[in-house]
Amino acid sequence: MKVRASIKKMCRNCKLVRRKGVLRVICSAEPRHKQRQG
């Protein structure tokens, strides 16, 4: 899980999701692409 000020989709499987007011990237193909805005 990377914590970044600016999060971007890294591949076509990445999805932007808002959970509890926090923007996240989840990726089914590559778990290393997981990110959180913070």
From Swiss-Prot:
Keywords: Ribonucleoprotein, Ribosomal protein
A molecular-function term among this protein's GO annotations: structural constituent of ribosome
Residue ranges of coiled coil: none
Origin: domain of life: Bacteria
One GO location term (cellular component): ribonucleoprotein complex
InterPro entries in UniProt: Ribosomal_bL36 (IPR000473), Ribosomal_bL36_sp (IPR035977)
The keyword ATP-binding appears for this protein: no
Biological process according to GO: translation
A Pfam family assignment: Ribosomal_L36
Stated family: Belongs to the bacterial ribosomal protein bL36 family.
Protein name: Large ribosomal subunit protein bL36
Phylogenetic lineage: Bacteria, Pseudomonadati, Pseudomonadota, Gammaproteobacteria, Cellvibrionales
